[in-house]
């Protein structure tokens, strides 16, 4: 901890442990919160850590809920994404009472989603008082340029879940997780971009003082290297209360508060369908025309559109 953000910081101790076995568990604080029989039965498997069911204690993100309670969401692959409350006076963990029915472990906290060593990591929770939802952002895939790294989002009306996607579902240990979660960004290319964005992930998000909402993440490119670059993109909320990432890094753009005339919307659009796959495939745009008569025309799709107040 430190009295100032610039530091210096003083070591106060560990918050949570993972990766131990039956011989090293005594060097952790696990047995301060659960009995040894429970710990060895559940947290240890085949003389090693039970990474299929319990979390990897990395990728922490600390936030405050709508009632100013302090929380830490964490986890990477392994047993999934977990949530623990923190004491705002000390930053130390407030370990909950076990509640197996609601996926609450006395040491690791509330399991939110994932498990089975599925590629879900880098959780970040942001509360939006306008929509009344907590948004849980996670990354799927691996962070190399060929790893299909991408950002998904789930939401909940309560800080401890359930966090669900646009279909009202969430991934558990025994499902194909790529089918779950609203995909915000992955590998994609637009005509004005010199290189495709690759492995876009491990994000945070924030709402600025002017109410604009942003996604912050790192990306690689299809340039034959693993060099990466941070990016900040504005997000807009659709009418169903889901964030939609704008395709270009922010340049201070502002969306009109009063909307747009129909004539301003008519025209040619480059449309990207990112799908739900986790791969090194690059989503390339197709061209669609929004016509003044309300029709949508293109080689890949057709339909209708309308402007609403």
Where are these regions (language model features)?
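Carbohydrate-active catalytic/glycan-binding domains of CAZyme proteins
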Residues: 1-309
């Amino acid at each position: 901890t430190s009295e100032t953000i610039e530091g210096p910081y003083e070591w106060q101790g560990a918050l949570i442990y993972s990766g131990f076995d039956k011989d090293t568990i005594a060097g952790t604080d696990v047995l301060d919160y659960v009995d040894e029989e429970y710990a060895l039965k559940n947290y240890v498997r085949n003389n090693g850590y039970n990474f299929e069911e319990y979390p990897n204690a990395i990728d922490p993100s600390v936030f405050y809920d709508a009632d100013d309670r302090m929380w830490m969401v964490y986890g990477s692959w392994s047993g999934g994404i977990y949530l623990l409350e923190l004491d705002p006076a000390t930053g130390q963990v407030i370990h909950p009472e076990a509640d197996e029915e609601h996926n609450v472990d006395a040491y690791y906290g509330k399991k939110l989603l994932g498990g089975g060593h599925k590629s879900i990591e880098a959780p970040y929770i942001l509360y939006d008082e306008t929509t009344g939802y907590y948004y849980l952002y996670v990354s799927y895939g691996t962070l190399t340029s060929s790893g299909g790294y991408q950002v998904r989002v789930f939401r909940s009306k309560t800080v401890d879940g359930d966090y669900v996607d646009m279909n009202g579902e969430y991934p558990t240990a025994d499902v194909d997780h790529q089918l779950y979660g609203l995909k915000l960004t992955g590998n994609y290319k637009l005509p004005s971009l010199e290189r495709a964005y690759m492995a876009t992930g491990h994000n945070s998000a924030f709402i600025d003082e002017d109410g604009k909402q942003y996604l912050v993440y790192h990306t690689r490119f299809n340039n034959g290297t693993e060099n990466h670059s941070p990016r900040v993109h504005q997000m807009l909320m659709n009418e169903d209360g889901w964030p939609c990432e704008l395709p270009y890094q922010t340049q201070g753009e502002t969306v009109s508060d009063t909307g747009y005339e129909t004539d301003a919307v008519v025209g040619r659009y480059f449309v990207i369908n990112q799908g739900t796959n986790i791969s090194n495939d690059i989503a390339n745009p197709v061209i669609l025309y929004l016509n003044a008569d309300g029709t949508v025309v293109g080689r890949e799709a057709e339909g209708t559109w309308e402007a609403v107040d």
